[in-house]
Structures are given as C-alpha cells and as structure tokens.
C-alpha cells in the first residue's frame, strides 16, 4: 500500500466518531491514576456503594489533583441522592444559603442511579468535573464546576475531618482505621 493511501486511511480513522475515546484523552487520564484507598458504605447489612480515591501519585494531597469514584450497589433516585448530599453539608456546618446555591448548581450532575452505575468527581486546579457511567456504558462528562467552594464542599462529604463517616474517610485516604 502506498504512503498516500495509508495516510488517507489514518485520517479517516481519526475522523470517525468514537475513535480514541476513553482513557487516552487528557480529560479521562484520572482513570489510570493509582488508588489512594477504597471504602464501602453499608447501612445495616445492605451495601449502598463502594468508593475509591485516586491521585496521580497514589497519595492524597488536598491541593493536588484527585478523583473520587463511587460505584452504587443500589438504585437511588436523584432526589434522594441530593437530599443525602444536602444533609451531609448541613452536618459539616454549611449554611442553608450555600446548600441551596450548590443544589441548584448540581442539578445536572447526576440523574437517577441504578445498581452498578458509577459517578466520579475529579478535582484539579481551580475546578472539578463530574462524570457518570451508567452500568455497561462509557463515562460521560455531566458537569464542570468552576466554583472552588462547591468543589471543596462536595469532596468534604468524604474527605473532611468532620465527616459523618470517619472510618470511611480513613479507608479512602489509605489510613488504617
């Protein structure tokens, strides 16, 4: 095959939808980061979700990039998930004004969750990005958060020293409970 035809085939392949999608794109590089720690949230004998924290170095540093990935073991409505999020923010001492503003901002971050669905929040530089992966499908960007206060508050649910689930936090940070 001559060089011109090879070049044409390569150009056509690159132009095809879906080509080079996945962990090779810079926005999805977090998938290849090593795990810092992992934890499972249970209620009684029911598993609610499994979570993992990832970072480029495999160690957590608050100001460095990191990704929180949650795999749900149960169906959860978007309203119930938002209520749980707001309840955790209330526990952490955020004001009603902040919680209402953030709830509005997160309106499109996720929909109803089904067993096996995954959500990820990737924090880097001055922003955060929400991703959703319905069971058996590819990751999709659902929301970019430019509000650093919101990005920090969302992660505080799991990573704050004042979290409602300190053992869960320690496990995510790779610490021994």
Can you describe what each PLM-predicted range is?
Residues 15-18:
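N-terminal signal peptide c-region/cleavage motif recognized by signal peptidases
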Residues 21-177:
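Terminal leader/tail segments of proteins
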Residues 1-9:
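Bacterial N-terminal signal peptides that target proteins for export
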